[in-house]
Structure formats: C-alpha cells, structure tokens
Amino acid sequence: MARDYYGILGVDRNATDSEIKKAYRKLARKYHPDVNPSEEAAEKFREASVAHEVLTDPDKRRIVDMGGDPMEQGGGAGHPGGFGSGGLGDIFDAFFGGGAGSRGPRSRVQPGSDTLWRTSITLEEAFTGVKKDLTLDTAVLCSKCHGSGSASNAKPKTCGTCHGSGEIQEVQRSFLGNVMTSRPCHTCNGTGEVIPDPCDECAGDGRVRARRDIVADIPAGIQSGMRIRMAGQGEVGAGGGPAGDLYVEVMVRPHAVFTRDGDDLHASIRVPMIDAALGSELEVESLTGEEITVVIPAGTQPNQVITLEGEGMPRLRAEGRGDLMAHVDLFVPTEIDDRTRELLEQIRDYRRDNSSVHREGEEHGGLFDKLKSKFRNR
C-alpha cells in the first residue's frame, strides 16, 4: 500500500515546494537525532526525510499523485532505515537551506509541466459530444533556436563559476560545528553548463511564452468535473525538453428543462387532471428536439415518476443510454367553460352517490362511459 507522504509532512496535496520544505524543516528540527535521541524520533525523522525527497522530486511526486509509491519502484532509498539518495543533503537543507554533499548538476533539459484548462459545455453538447477550440497561453519551443538555447546552435560550455558541479559550496557555523553546505550555482542555475551565445528570442531557455490553439475532442456522455488528458499538449520543458500533458476539465452548464443525475435525466411534464384520471398519451420534446411519447397510466398521481428507459444520456465510452424520469406535474384548470363545469358536477354527484367509482361505474355504465367519452374528446 502506498505511503501517505503528504500526511507524513502534514501538508495537503496541493502544497507548493516551499510549503513542503517548510514543513520538513519544522519536523527535522523536532526529530533530528542530535536534538531528540529517542528511537521513535529517529523513525519519524527518517520518514520525514523520505517524504521530503519524494515530494520535492517532480517525477516521484507525479507517481504519488497517481496512487503509486516511487520508493517501492526502485526510485527511493536503497537500504532499510536509510535516508535514500540525497537524504543526507536534505537533513542539512532543513537547517541551513543547502546540502551537505554534492548532488551533481541537474540536467539543463527538463520535462515540461502539465497544464490544467477548464471549459464549459451545454447539456446538449454533453449528449452528442463536441470538439472545443481552446486558446492557451503556454510555453512553446523557441522557433529561432529550436530549443537549443543557443543563437548559433553551439554546444553548452562548462560553467566557470561552479566548474560543472552545478553547486557553490560554503562553510557555515552551527551547533553541530562547521558544516559544509552547497547551493545551486547562480550562474548556471545548477546545470553546470552555460550557453556561450544565448538565443536573443528565448534568452537561452529554449522556450518562449505564446498563445496556441488546440482542439479538445470531448466525448458524448461526459459529466461535470471529468478531465480529458491530452498527452504532450502541456508546456514545453526548459532546454527544449519534452512537453507535459494538458488536462481539460469539463463543466456541464445547467439546463432550463432537464436535470442530470449520472446517466439519467429528470424533467417535469404537465399532465391535465382528466388525462391523469383516465389515462392518456402525451408528446414531449427530448433533449435533442425529438418527440417522445409518454404513456400516462389511468389514475396517475401528482409527482408520480414515469420512467422512459433508454431516453437519458449516452454512457461514456460505452453502449446504451440512461433513462428519462418524467415527474408528473398535475394541471388543474383555474377557468372552465359551462359545459365542462356541468360534466364535472355530474362526476362529483356520481361519486357522492356511490361508494366505489369502479363498481358503480360498471352498474351505471351509460352515464360513466358517456362522461368518459366526452372528456376524452375535449
């Protein structure tokens, strides 16, 4: 089972790198063996160090966010109870903001970040599926240097400040004594290399900000809050690194008539009192504008739900559709003509004089059938 690295540090899943480092420093000061010699503290210190290592590594953090555990996939500490690769440096980073030992330069070419884009569609578009045009402000490959960062396509040279290590080492005094710490080189930004003739378009980064048009194919049956992954459509990485992914989050706007519940649709239908009593068939308009026949059973009650199977939303990437739930809104007229009033009064008198409408209707079929016929013909 994957460990809860966010819980170990006491941060939420949306925590920034600075928040993660701040939480780690707080725990490191509390549980460091030189401050707290207990075995329990040593275990908590080890857990915090591993969690910090994982969550400050973009690739490892992505594995965690997908439900995995990078420390169980050959990407973490190699020895039980150890601090993992770079763990000792993380300990000193908690106290002094730098590492105790050299970790080596980071690659100048970095993978790009994922991008989240939110868009809204109508319920009709969610029913049929739709292609949505998106315009993104994102990092794209520099068209002038094609990602190399160099104006003349020259190869990077070793940084003269850090001599290729990517780090600047310093000696700091602490309660532990003199400690050698290291920080990313400010000249090469920790890569150990510099571009001798930076591209004037991207300043040597290999990418620029630009607006880019993308078409998102939104499938039929999608629901609010769902995300569509478009691989390689995110931001291009530094140094012309591979682009991240684009996630399009869809919000389905409310509809004036239909309410959605999963793959089912709900709608109110107005049923005249006589049709509810005698039974009838009504034509209603579906979400797509087609006419649907709704059978109203005799004796239908107010707020009764009539299910129309297979008339709901399409199932996402599957066959079939949900159901349409028709909620009966019983309509009682506020104004009636004299003939209608006369017939209704006859029904009322008939019901008063007979204890059972069904039984007496059979015995006095002439009057009941006559009234029934007249109401059907109105």
UniProtKB/Swiss-Prot annotation:
Positions of the J domain: 4-68
Binding site for Zn(2+) 1: C142, C145, C199, C202
Gene3D superfamilies: 6.20.20.10, DnaJ domain, Urease metallochaperone UreE, N-terminal domain
Pfam families to which the protein is assigned, alphabetical: DnaJ, DnaJ_C, DnaJ_CXXCXGXG
Recorded superkingdom: Bacteria
The protein's name in its UniProt record: Chaperone protein DnaJ 1
CXXCXGXG motif repeat ranges per the UniProt record: 142-149, 159-166, 185-192, 199-206
Summary of subunit composition and partner proteins: Homodimer.
Subcellular location: Cytoplasm
Co-factor: note: Binds 2 Zn(2+) ions per monomer.
Residue ranges covered by zinc fingers (CR-type): 129-211
Binding positions for Zn(2+) 2 per the UniProt entry: C159, C162, C185, C188
Keyword Nucleotide-binding listed: no
Keywords: Chaperone, Cytoplasm, DNA replication, Metal-binding, Repeat, Stress response, Zinc, Zinc-finger
Annotated organism of origin: Corynebacterium efficiens (strain DSM 44549 / YS-314 / AJ 12310 / JCM 11189 / NBRC 100395)
Gene Ontology annotations of biological process type: chaperone cofactor-dependent protein refolding; DNA replication; protein refolding; response to heat
Primary role: Participates actively in the response to hyperosmotic and heat shock by preventing the aggregation of stress-denatured proteins and by disaggregating proteins, also in an autonomous, DnaK-independent fashion. Unfolded proteins bind initially to DnaJ; upon interaction with the DnaJ-bound protein, DnaK hydrolyzes its bound ATP, resulting in the formation of a stable complex. GrpE releases ADP from DnaK; ATP binding to DnaK triggers the release of the substrate protein, thus completing the reaction cycle.
A GO term, aspect molecular function: unfolded protein binding
